[in-house]
């Protein structure tokens, strides 16, 4: 893979946490790529490591880190080699921004939303508050927030409007990439659809790339160019969206898609039996083996990553 042709190239990224029970392998040898003006959707069950992946990319690390290593190339530069000051000046909120989970509830209730959105621009773009507020109004226009809302407080806005404000805050420094962690959770269906339309418009108008972290398959499919399936801290399948949604390859991916209710069928959605493994002291074999209907002896060994019809799948079935 030529890292110069990719906006983001992640190679063997690892983030393990130290706990009393042992090391939690939240992100373990993760690999994937993201091109310019593209969107990758990271799908998986709760607790599989999706949010930890976003923290690993942005180096937002807790104190109990046991292992943090790998390569993260942003526009051809391995930013894992940056010092913390270099990372803050060139990557976090500059090259890559984050809309965290429940972002609409993270706004300061006693500060006007315009001032909150302006703050990253003042800090990272080294501009005046007046210039920053002018930029905020432009970002509000892109995300569908009335410009006069710069003087309002968060409690005066609906949940959907606060989510748009959080998105404007991520956009205000003009990053090439925005990571969105469950951006439509806790929103009603109509508001979810509106937020996804905003993201598609931003992608088209500004050329912004996205990593969309979610467990909502139906909603995320509207934005996805690529799909990455995460299970127990690992990426088990990556594929173009046009190939993945009609024909997923990994058994977990197949069962995940079969669990989505469909309107024009009498078939009941599938339930994935069993529980995901604990991320502490994981075995060396396939991490989905205990729940997999296709399990055989080889699954006790670490599965290879196999290239199949343009997709990459971590499974012995395709070796």
Predicted regions and their residues:
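A short, proline-enriched helix->beta-strand linker immediately N-terminal to the Walker B motif
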Residues: 172-176
